């Protein structure tokens, strides 16, 4: 399993253990990736398609659609509370802190993971993806991280997510270090 956030028995410690095991078992090249405003940029139309594939009851799908479009109360830097419809207006983003947000964020990240596997990149690059919420690393066989970075960018673009290039990098362990 690649996703370690929000699932039963999953947590940050298990993600770190998996990363260490992959490093130890021949995956020393790492793509340490950061997505720009992941929760705030998940496109509603594509997310609803993912939900629809897994939902038999159309009423549930309708409720999730309505929830994505409702206004959200936010606190500004001065501590004032305001209501915003930015997600509805932009047709993207899920509010953090809502009970259903973790499920939806994992579901959308799954699109990337399935795309990676469908292209056979897990086998071709000898790679293993480990995610925790919006944190993402791809552990590869030596010499494969640059290609993994290329494909990660390509797949993220195809699912309408933006890679934060300032925070995304290739790291070769043990020479380099990364935080997960």
Region annotations inferred by a language model:
Residues 180:
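Active-site and adjacent loop segments of nucleotide-processing enzymes
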């Amino acid at each position: 399993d690649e996703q370690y956030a929000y699932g039963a028995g999953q947590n940050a410690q298990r993600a770190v253990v998996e990363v260490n095991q992959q490093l130890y078992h021949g995956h020393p090249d790492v793509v340490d990736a950061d997505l720009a405003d992941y929760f705030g940029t998940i496109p509603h139309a594509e997310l609803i398609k993912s939900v629809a594939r897994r939902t038999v009851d159309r009423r549930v799908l309708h409720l999730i659609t309505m929830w994505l479009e409702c206004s959200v109360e936010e606190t500004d830097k001065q501590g004032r509370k305001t209501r915003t419809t930015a997600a509805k207006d932009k047709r993207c983003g899920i509010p953090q802190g809502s009970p259903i947000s973790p499920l939806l964020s994992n579901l959308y990240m799954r699109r990337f993971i399935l795309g990676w596997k469908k292209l056979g990149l897990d086998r071709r690059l000898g790679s293993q993806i480990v995610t925790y919420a919006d944190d993402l690393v791809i552990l590869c066989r030596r010499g494969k991280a640059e290609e993994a970075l290329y494909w990660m960018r390509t797949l993220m673009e195809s699912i309408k997510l933006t890679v934060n290039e300032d925070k995304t990098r290739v790291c070769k362990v043990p020479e380099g270090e990364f935080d997960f």
